[in-house]
Regions:
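Helicase-core coupling region on the C-terminal RecA-like lobe
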Residues: 1-43, 99-101, 136-142, 146-176
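Conserved helicase motor "Helicase C" RecA-like lobe of SF1/SF2 P-loop NTPases
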Residues: 43-90
């Protein structure tokens, strides 16, 4: 509901857990996540355009690990009917390095546990476990970060579990 989305957008960082059956045409796409990305993008667009012109390079960016999910998200953004959203950069974490946006949406697109190996890039530094890809994804957001994914699978990874627990403690975890 729009009220739920307003609540989601009131947090600096939020996690939307998409559970249930994904209409899987491939493990590298998640239509439910793509639809949520598009819906939230449209609401963010309308919020911004009440105050100023929408500038995609400044206001909004979308990160996802797979090219096929990029295409799925683009299709769903097109379905919103908001032409400006088609100019929003949607790319992989690696290709988004160096670019920041006011709001970043991260579609994790993990449909099975084996995909965590591809999503995660962990190493130890000074006794601390660090995920380079997640770190880059989180630091692209100037004002707000929205993570969309299946928490059931993501929580199998130590760092994602810690992130989800942190977000739950902030009251910004939403089960859809």
């Amino acid at each position: 509901s729009d009220l739920q989305i307003q609540n989601i957008l009131s947090h600096r960082i939020a996690f939307i857990s998409i559970s249930g059956k994904n209409k899987i045409s491939s493990y590298k796409t998640n239509i439910n996540e793509a639809q949520w990305v598009a819906h939230i993008s449209a609401i963010i667009y309308h919020r911004i355009t009440k105050k100023e012109s929408f500038v995609p390079e400044k206001h909004l960016g979308i990160i996802t690990p797979y090219r096929s999910q990029i295409a799925t998200i683009k299709k769903e953004l097109g379905n919103t009917g908001i032409i400006e959203l088609l100019s929003v950069t949607i790319d992989t974490v690696e290709r988004f390095q160096g670019g920041q946006r006011d709001v970043m949406i991260f579609s994790c697109c993990v449909n099975a546990p084996f995909q965590l190996q591809f999503l995660c890039n962990t190493f130890k530094e000074n006794g601390q476990l660090i995920d380079r890809k997640l770190n880059v994804a989180l630091t692209r957001a100037r004002e707000q970060m929205i993570v969309i994914g299946n928490s059931h699978w993501l929580e199998r990874d130590t760092i994602y579990r810690q992130l989800i627990e942190y977000i739950k403690d902030k009251g910004a975890f939403f089960q859809i």
